[in-house]
Regions:
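Extracellular polysaccharide-degrading/modifying enzymes targeting complex plant/algal/animal polysaccharides
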Residues: 38-262
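Secretory targeting and sorting signals
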Residues: 2-25
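Low-complexity, acidic Ser/Thr/Pro-rich repeat tracts that form intrinsically disordered stalk/linker regions
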Residues: 25-35
Length: 264
């Protein structure tokens, strides 16, 4: 089965951070006689019909439109999407000569200067669970419990735990209402669930002078059926939490695992 080859590409339950996964080889297309759905992050619209003349803009819209055996063909560009479920046997591939990138990082549009050489996003950024650790006591994990990521001009910043520590090479997540535990020393006792959004990111460089990307997705793709093929797609910058049992109010338990192949 094609899914077996995908699994061999080491993307089962993979947490995708600074390193990237370049999917450059895949088995034959899901079906030679299926439809081709064209997608262009830069020149498409999800109001389009998926033809070459009117491509869709997102992979998510293409997956909804596709039927079993179809091919989703990606034009060059950056696709800022996540939590995508592949429930049909489709091929997702780069168009000829294209090098598409699927990333979980967004480029915030709203920043405010703090007057102290630091800049903050709005307070509507994604809240990641920082107590969802394999260790039942998250305090023993330290900074490793925090899955958040920020990139400036493509280079990762180092996360710190206070605004005072923010420099040009570090960032801080200001979360006034983080996910907490019912038992502070044992996350297996359950979580106090909080809204999906409500945090702010603080950096020490002027975002008007740089490209700043903040990871806002936990998982890239979930493969939920057989006969799925990928080709020519780079996948990068996803922030999966360590445990899979946190019920996020928007994305449920798929905050664990950067990319997942469900076994049949």
């Amino acid at each position: 089965m094609k899914r077996r080859i995908v699994a061999q590409m080491a993307i089962l339950a993979l947490s995708l951070s600074a390193p990237v996964l370049a999917v450059t080889h895949a088995p034959q297309a899901a079906a030679a006689d299926g439809n081709i759905i064209h997608v262009s992050a830069e020149g498409g619209s999800d109001a389009g019909d998926g033809t070459a003349a009117k491509p869709l803009q997102t992979i998510g819209a293409a997956l909804k439109k596709a039927g079993g055996g179809d091919t989703i063909e990606l034009a060059n560009g950056t696709y800022r999407e996540g939590e995508l479920a592949v429930d049909k046997g489709v091929t997702i591939k780069a168009a000829e000569g294209a090098k598409p990138v699927l990333t979980g990082a967004e480029v915030p549009k709203s920043w405010s200067a703090g007057g102290d050489g630091k800049w903050s996003t709005g307070k509507d950024m994604v809240r990641f669970c920082t107590v969802c650790t394999i260790n039942a006591d998250p305090t023993k994990e330290g900074i490793a419990a925090h899955p958040e990521q920020v990139f400036v001009d493509g280079k990762p910043l180092t996360q710190v735990l206070s605004r005072a520590e923010v420099t040009e090479s570090t960032f801080y997540v200001d979360d006034p209402d983080p996910v907490t535990l019912k038992n502070p020393k044992n996350n297996q006792a359950g979580y106090n669930v909080k809204p999906h959004r409500g945090t702010s990111y603080v950096i020490g460089v002027d975002p008007n002078q740089h490209q700043v990307e903040v990871v806002q997705h936990s998982r890239a793709l979930s493969f939920n059926t057989d006969n799925i093929a990928l080709s020519g797609l780079t996948v990068e910058k996803y922030s999966a939490v360590q445990r899979w049992d946190y019920e996020d109010p928007e994305i449920g338990t798929i905050s664990g695992g950067g990319m997942v192949v469900a076994a049949h």
